[in-house]
C-alpha cells in the first residue's frame, strides 16, 4: 500500500550548497579521533555527513484500498514519522547525527482513470499536527 521514493536534496538546499565550500559534492567530512586505551595509540577516522539543516523532497504514495481506513492509516503513518523524529537514521545517532524532521505536508487524491487531483487538506493537517 505504501510506495516510498528515494529522497533527493531539494532545489533550495542545492542552491545553498553552490554558495558554500563543502568537502564533497553536497556534504562535509568530519575528522574524529579515538585513543586505544590499552596502547595509547591514536585511531583517526573520518565521517562523511550531510550538513545540518539540509532539506530533502519526500514522495510517498499511499494506495487507497479501503476508504474507511484512510484516516486511521494516516494517523498510524503520522505516528511513525513522529517516532522517526525521536530516533535517528544511520550511524552515530548518540552524537546527534541522523536526526530528521518532517514538515509542510501536502496530500492529494489522484484519480487514476481521469488524472483529476484533489487536495486533502484535512489529512495534511493530521500529519502536520503529529510531527514534532
Walk through the language-model features, giving the residues of each.
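Small/polar/charged residue-enriched interaction surfaces, especially the RNA/DNA-contacting tracks
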Residues: 1-132
